[in-house]
UniProtKB/Swiss-Prot annotation:
<feature type="domain" description="Thioredoxin">
    <location>
        <begin position="2"/>
        <end position="88"/>
    </location>
</feature>
<feature type="disulfide bond" description="Redox-active">
    <location>
        <begin position="31"/>
        <end position="34"/>
    </location>
</feature>
<feature type="site" description="Contributes to redox potential value">
    <location>
        <position position="32"/>
    </location>
</feature>
<dbReference type="Pfam" id="PF00085">
    <property type="entry name" value="Thioredoxin"/>
</dbReference>
<keyword id="KW-0813">Transport</keyword>
<comment type="function">
    <text>Participates in various redox reactions through the reversible oxidation of its active center dithiol to a disulfide and catalyzes dithiol-disulfide exchange reactions.</text>
</comment>
<dbReference type="InterPro" id="IPR005746">
    <property type="entry name" value="Thioredoxin"/>
</dbReference>
<keyword id="KW-1015">Disulfide bond</keyword>
<protein>
    <recommendedName>
        <fullName>Thioredoxin-2</fullName>
    </recommendedName>
</protein>
<dbReference type="GO" id="GO:0004791">
    <property type="term" value="F:thioredoxin-disulfide reductase (NADPH) activity"/>
</dbReference>
<comment type="similarity">
    <text>Belongs to the thioredoxin family.</text>
</comment>
<dbReference type="InterPro" id="IPR013766">
    <property type="entry name" value="Thioredoxin_domain"/>
</dbReference>
<dbReference type="GO" id="GO:0045454">
    <property type="term" value="P:cell redox homeostasis"/>
</dbReference>
<dbReference type="InterPro" id="IPR017937">
    <property type="entry name" value="Thioredoxin_CS"/>
</dbReference>
<dbReference type="GO" id="GO:0006457">
    <property type="term" value="P:protein folding"/>
</dbReference>
<keyword id="KW-0249">Electron transport</keyword>
<feature type="active site" description="Nucleophile">
    <location>
        <position position="34"/>
    </location>
</feature>
């Protein structure tokens, strides 16, 4: 069972940005590499249970300021206590 939270609103994303340890998967339904990496992301969510794992479809949340930063998918952001610490 996956622990990945699928974000459906800007408010929900803002709430999760304050998590102690957060990993965000930015992707799109039309993106083949995104679909390929999804099972790995889900597996990692079960292995690293002290982290919050969320999935953001960039086409559904295109108005969020963080989503506007995304230039390619998949993109992963890592946050700790509300601050971005890394990305790839």
């Amino acid at each position: 069972m996956s622990r990945v939270i699928h974000i459906s609103s800007n408010e929900e994303l803002d709430k999760h940005l304050q998590a102690e340890r957060l990993v965000i998967d930015f992707s799109a339904a039309w993106c083949g590499p995104c679909r390929a990496i999804s099972p790995v992301f889900e597996k990692l969510s079960n292995e690293f249970v002290t982290f919050t794992f969320v999935h953001v479809d960039i086409d559904k949340l295109s108005g969020h300021p963080i989503v506007k930063e995304i230039r390619s998918v998949p993109t992963f952001y890592f946050y700790r206590n509300g601050a971005k610490v890394s990305e790839f």
